[in-house]
Amino acid sequence: IELDVQLTKDGIPVVIHDETIDRVTEKKGWVKDYTLKELKELTVLKNKFPEYSAAKIPTLEEVLDAVKASGIQVNIELKTGIYWYPEIEQKVADLVKKAGMEERVIYSSFNHYSIQQMKKIVPEAETAYLYSDVILNVAEYAKNTKVDGLHPAVYHVKMADFLKEYLGSNLNVRVWTVNEKADMKWLIDAEVTAIITNYPDMAVQIKKEAEA
């Protein structure tokens, strides 16, 4: 699974995609301006999904505890592209270590400095650069900064021969967000490391068909 992590006002890592709570709660404002207690008082998307009317914004620790027994791999995106939360890298690394999941976590971010910082904190961790625009010699750039993978946008890899270049780099290549069947089949056939999608059931079925 892929999830996004930010810090509350009191420095607790929470799992939420947007930098604000406007879209998913009845309140407005930045995640960073609410304490964990204040966020826990809110319900998430209760009007859109009444069957989950008690849903809350989870902490990263809660999510790791929930998936730990499953053996599933977790891709943690550090949401530091707009606001770089102080010490988020260390806080997240500490929680992953506490959960005993160091071997099952991938760290990624659009803020490449944040990923480089994570690599300094946990040199053995698997890391990847997220990006949507063209970065010249991106594979060389990743290797020179000791980063292990590339996470480009699907519309990016469809341009020119970028995918061929990335696959030839021996770096892990995970493409986002792949929601179209044709794109899924193309990338699975190309043997990318993984695809990031909102429709995992569809992707799993296409992968099974490709392996049949």
What kind of feature is each model-predicted range?
Residues 1-7, 13, 76:
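Conserved metal-phosphate-binding beta-hairpin within the catalytic cores
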Residues 11, 89-91, 113-114, 137-139, ...:
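Short, flexible segments with low predicted structural confidence
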Residues 6-10, 18-19, 79-81, 110-112, ...:
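Active-site beta-loop-alpha junctions enriched in small/polar residues
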Residues 2-3, 77, 106, 152, ...:
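Residue-level detector of family-conserved "landmark" positions at structurally sensitive sites
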